[in-house]
């Protein structure tokens, strides 16, 4: 298996290197390496590889091909000297009996692999090396081209002292004499009629090289497709027995195919006007020769598979559509209620709907709910039954927070009173009153219509009542244990529960201080 792989690699490399010998045939290489140094064909292949190496490398040793198996020992000695000069890294080729090294098939394949790799490396180094200066007279390639022109025209060898102008003048004269002997339209008019300078020829050469590289890639692709297609024919069991016959037919034709083209600027100069004729491929005369029966076969009706952009439904959205947030039920903004009142089983005030006021204090011994909430503005007059704390804007009158016995006066109000008392006025003061363990204190200060108050007091222990309902927009506060301020300036304190004054368990009326 290993020998087969080595044989395949060697054959491909030999084709790339340009070898044209008989060992490219199917099975020929394997037969030659089986005999080793006794095979003249094997020695010829080795001699060809060494000769190509000597062109690129400075080698003293040389290898000559043999004509008979009797010259095998001499060939092996020459190969041994060459490998020693090249510092071959394979011990099986440089050690052991010299006359028996190349009689083994594996060693022969290894020798070919080594020589091929060295030749490929030498050619790559030569390509990458800087070009040498051309010899005087245009170099050997130009000399060979000019020599071919002289031979084709039947010219004699030019003298050694002839100039280039004289040489090309002689070629032009000979061409005119030759063209005069042929019919007028035998050659045709040239396709390129304009004269070109050195800069133009350089650009044309660059264009030709770019096109040549492109078509080389295309040729390699087509050749590889051809190789794969032919190889696929041998996969069936029936074709495996015909592999040798297929190779004998295919390999000669395959070797002719070259990936590199031979088109040069000379072909451009030789192009004639007949190449520029445009032929219609759909004309009646042309289709008479190109028509075939398969063009007349019509396909049957096939089902419509759809897929048109205008018929495709849009995909469902990844996110649900945005919806406007629905507002909740409209409620009137209410404030926090007043404090706890007196001995009541129900709350009269509750939260005010549109009334904005201060907070009430905590009452004393009461079973009722919380007092009224925030109120709105009170327009005009004093407030009858005012709560613990008054707020908002009062256009007239004098409004003073009442006094709740046994309650907690915790709110504060800061309203603006358009009228009222000017200057400094000390309103009624209730302080230090013991209301069933409660403490009430009311600090009041009024200056020029600005009414500010702050009350604090701790009422007695009592059960919490429920919250009162929402109050209406108009009207005063429902007061539990509220206080009224009479016009005469007299301050009275009582529980508003049917006008009944309640005193129980140490709860009593507080002392009144009037200024």
UniProtKB/Swiss-Prot annotation:
Residues 382-395, 457-481 have a biased composition (Gly residues). It holds the Pfam family DUF2465. Residues 302-311, 444-456 have a biased composition (Basic and acidic residues). Residues 485-501 have a biased composition (Low complexity). One of its GO terms (molecular function) is protein methyltransferase activity. GO terms for biological process: lysosome localization; positive regulation of cell population proliferation; positive regulation of gene expression; positive regulation of ruffle assembly; protein methylation. It comes from the Eukaryota. Residues 502-515 have a biased composition (Polar residues). Residues 297-411, 432-515 are annotated as: Disordered. GO terms for cellular component: tRNA-splicing ligase complex. Positively stimulates PRMT1-induced protein arginine methylation. Involved in skeletal homeostasis. Positively regulates lysosome peripheral distribution and ruffled border formation in osteoclasts. PANTHER family: FAM98, PROTEIN FAM98A. Interacts (via N- and C-terminus) with DDX1. Interacts (via N- and C-terminus) with C14orf166. Interacts with FAM98B. Interacts with PLEKHM1 (via N- and C-terminus). Belongs to the FAM98 family. This is Protein FAM98A. The gene is Fam98a.
């Amino acid at each position: 298996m290993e020998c087969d792989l080595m044989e395949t690699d060697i054959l491909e490399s030999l084709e790339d290197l340009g070898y044209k010998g008989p060992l490219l045939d199917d099975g020929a290489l394997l037969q030659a390496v089986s005999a080793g140094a006794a095979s003249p064909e094997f020695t010829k292949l080795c001699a060809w590889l060494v000769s190509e190496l000597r062109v690129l490398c400075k080698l003293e040793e040389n290898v000559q091909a043999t004509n008979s198996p009797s010259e095998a020992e001499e060939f092996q000695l020459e190969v041994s000297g060459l490998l020693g000069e090249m510092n071959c890294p394979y011990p099986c080729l440089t050690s052991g009996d010299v006359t028996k090294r190349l009689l083994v098939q594996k060693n022969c394949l290894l020798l070919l692999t080594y020589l091929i790799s060295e030749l490929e490396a030498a050619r790559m180094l030569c390509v990458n090396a800087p070009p040498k200066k051309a010899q005087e007279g245009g170099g050997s390639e130009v000399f060979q081209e000019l020599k071919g022109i002289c031979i084709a025209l039947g010219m004699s060898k030019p003298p050694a002292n002839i100039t280039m102008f004289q040489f090309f003048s002689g070629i032009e004269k000979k061409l005119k004499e030759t063209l005069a002997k042929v019919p007028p339209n035998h050659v045709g008019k040239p396709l390129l009629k304009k004269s070109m300078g050195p800069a133009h020829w350089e650009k044309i050469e660059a264009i030709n090289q770019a096109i040549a590289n492109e078509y080389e890639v295309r040729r390699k692709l087509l050749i590889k497709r051809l190789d794969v297609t032919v190889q696929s024919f041998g996969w069936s069991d029936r074709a495996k027995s015909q592999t040798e016959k297929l190779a004998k037919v295919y390999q000669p034709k395959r070797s002719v195919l070259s990936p590199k083209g031979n088109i040069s600027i000379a072909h451009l100069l030789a192009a004639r006007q007949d190449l520029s004729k445009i032929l219609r491929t759909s004309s009646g005369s042309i289709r008479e020769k190109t028509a075939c029966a398969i063009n007349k076969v019509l396909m049957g009706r096939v089902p419509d598979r759809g897929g048109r952009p205008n018929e495709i439904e849009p995909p469902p959205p990844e996110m649900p559509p945005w919806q406007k947030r629905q507002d909740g039920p409209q409620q009137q903004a209410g404030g926090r209620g007043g404090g706890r009142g007196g001995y009541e089983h129900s709350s009269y005030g509750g939260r005010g709907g549109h009334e904005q006021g201060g907070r009430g204090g905590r009452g004393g011994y009461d079973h009722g709910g919380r007092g009224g909430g925030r109120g709105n503005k009170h327009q005009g007059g004093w407030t009858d039954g005012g709560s613990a704390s008054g707020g908002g804007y009062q256009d007239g009158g004098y409004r003073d927070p009442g006094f709740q016995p046994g309650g907690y006066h915790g709110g504060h109000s800061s309203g603006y009173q358009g009228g009222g008392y000017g200057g400094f006025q000390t309103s009624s003061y209730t302080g230090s009153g013991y209301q069933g363990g409660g403490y009430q204190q009311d600090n009041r200060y009024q200056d020029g219509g600005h009414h500010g108050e702050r009350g604090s007091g701790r009422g007695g222990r009592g059960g919490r009542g429920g919250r009162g309902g929402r109050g209406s927009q108009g009207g005063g506060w429902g007061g539990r244990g509220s206080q009224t301020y009479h016009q005469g300036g007299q301050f009275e304190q009582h529980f508003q529960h049917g006008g009944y004054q309640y005193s129980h368990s140490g709860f009593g009326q507080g002392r009144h201080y009037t200024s």
